[in-house]
């Protein structure tokens, strides 16, 4: 399980510089399972994120803190670039549709594009044959931005309806149209979410026997979030002024990571690592959009197996469970009928700058969230070493958390892919330093669902109030979302 990294005395300056660079460049990851990175460093990524049972370099301690004692003193720095392209095609509302809560202008929208840096760093000190300690920092997240288009709100109701700039109506009324009730957001028209999570961890590993080690890590987490283009939904939030377009907001918190690494037989090893839910402070600027105000980082459980079928060859298989469903803003699903009956219609009929709180509105206890569920990710990797060069390949699947029926969530953040194919190689230099390279491709994934809010039937609620019946039917407009990503990572491991 060990890669020997020649040891020298620790050097504090490179560590500090790497940490500063990491914090300066931290941006969301793209080839991800939900918002979780599939692996840390080019060696793990070349295996599609498998490696809970392997201590290949210091990045192993970011997944499994028990790995540190199997490594010599050393450091690793990784820098990747991502080229994501996310698109959503929106169809027209059916010809027989007379009313709708919100429908998006038909067309093709590019929601994610660009080149993004993805840095990480890890450090390990081997104190003795039985103990090791170190630290590391990494980032992940979610980013989406959709420009152009318009949205119709309360379509078909004379005096109520409005058509606004922006795919969710966050901008001003379209030229030549009226907005008597002020439903348009009159703010940023582009629709987007930008969430970055940075984890700083310090680990301690202890070898119980020659073949068994355990580890623990304290984890500090910082988050940065921005929401744009949701101004039309401010009227349907419990805190309208804290719904959208308020710049970046920050939160922080922490938790614990535990790990075990066991060589159960010659050529066979197993590993397991658990990270607790990382509790976070509230995003005060976006309490009107985020259920409960805070966005905790979901707990994860990783279990891995590695087998050495022949000298220099390894086969790895990992399982990863991510409990997104336990985090209320992620796990809360959009209930279209309840949102219509208990939020949209009451707020539409009774306009107020200081509305009373309604549980079904944005930010409420029963308000809409991302509609994500728990995921189980399967990772398979193969590694072959020939002299100073090591080749890797991997494939992972099963990491899409978005539940069926969460159409608007997919439009807001379609950057979800659950299949990753990877290739990697390493070159050990004469100095003992190692260069790792990984190419990650998130295979294009397409989802097709209907916008149940785009077609509605007028009805009467209890008390003879106006109401809508919203459910999926052929008159609803269709949303087809797709995402594809290429990432290139280069890691450098050395003995400071």
Regions flagged by a language model, labelled:
Residues 55-63, 69-161, 197-198:
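Outer-membrane beta-barrel translocator/receptor signature
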Residues 1-13:
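N-terminal secretory signal peptides that target proteins for export/translocation
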Residues 28-73, 266-267:
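Outer-membrane beta-barrel biogenesis signature
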Residues 30-40, 44-45, 115-496:
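Outer-membrane beta-barrel porins/channels
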Residues 14-26:
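Bacterial N-terminal signal peptides
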């Amino acid at each position: 399980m060990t890669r020997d990294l020649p040891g020298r005395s620790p050097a504090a300056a490179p560590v500090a510089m790497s940490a500063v660079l990491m914090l300066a460049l931290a941006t969301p990851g793209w080839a991800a399972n939900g918002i979780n990175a599939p692996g840390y460093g080019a060696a793990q990524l070349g295996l599609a994120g498998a490696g809970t049972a392997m201590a290949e370099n210091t990045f192993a301690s970011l997944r499994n803190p028990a790995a540190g004692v199997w490594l010599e003193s050393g450091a690793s720095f990784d820098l990747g670039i991502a080229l994501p392209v996310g698109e959503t095609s929106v169809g027209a509302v059916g010809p027989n549709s007379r009313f709708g809560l919100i429908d998006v202008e038909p067309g093709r929208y590019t929601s994610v594009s660009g080149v993004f840096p993805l840095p990480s760093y890890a450090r390990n000190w081997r104190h003795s044959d039985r103990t090791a300690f170190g630290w590391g920092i990494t980032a992940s997240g979610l980013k989406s931005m959709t420009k152009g288009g318009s949205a119709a709100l309360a379509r078909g109701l004379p005096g109520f309806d409005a058509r606004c700039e922006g795919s969710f109506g966050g901008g001003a009324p379209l030229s030549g149209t009226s907005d008597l009730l002020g439903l348009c957001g009159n703010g940023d028209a582009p629709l987007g979410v930008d969430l970055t999570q940075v984890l700083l961890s310090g680990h301690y590993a202890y070898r119980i026997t020659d073949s068994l080690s355990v580890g623990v890590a304290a984890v500090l987490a910082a988050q940065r979030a921005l929401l744009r283009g949701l101004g039309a939904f401010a009227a349907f939030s419990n805190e309208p002024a804290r719904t959208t377009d308020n710049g970046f907001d920050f939160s922080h918190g922490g938790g614990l990571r535990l790990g075990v690494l066991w060589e159960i037989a010659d050529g066979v090893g197993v590993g397991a690592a658990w990270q607790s839910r990382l509790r976070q402070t509230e995003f005060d600027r976006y309490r009107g959009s985020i259920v409960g105000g805070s966005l905790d980082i979901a707990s994860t459980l990783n279990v891995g197996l590695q087998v050495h079928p022949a000298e220099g060859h390894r086969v790895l298989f990992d399982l990863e469970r991510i409990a997104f469903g336990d985090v209320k803003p992620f796990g809360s699903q959009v209930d279209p009928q309840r949102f219509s009956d208990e939020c949209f219609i009451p707020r539409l009929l009774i306009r107020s700058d200081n509305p009373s709180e309604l549980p079904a509105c944005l930010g409420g206890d029963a308000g809409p969230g991302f509609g994500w569920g728990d995921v189980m990710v399967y990772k398979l990797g193969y590694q072959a070493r020939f002299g100073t060069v090591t080749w890797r390949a991997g494939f992972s699947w099963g990491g899409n958390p978005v539940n069926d029926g969460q159409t608007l969530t997919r439009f807001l953040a379609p950057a979800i892919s659950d299949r990753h194919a990877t290739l990697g190689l390493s070159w050990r230099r004469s100095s003992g330093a190692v260069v790792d390279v990984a190419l990650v491709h998130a295979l294009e994934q397409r989802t097709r669902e209907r916008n149940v809010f785009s077609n509605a039937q007028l009805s009467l609620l209890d008390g003879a109030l106006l109401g809508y019946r919203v459910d999926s039917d052929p008159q609803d407009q269709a949303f087809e979302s797709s995402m594809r990503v290429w990432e290139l990572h280069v890691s450098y491991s050395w003995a400071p």
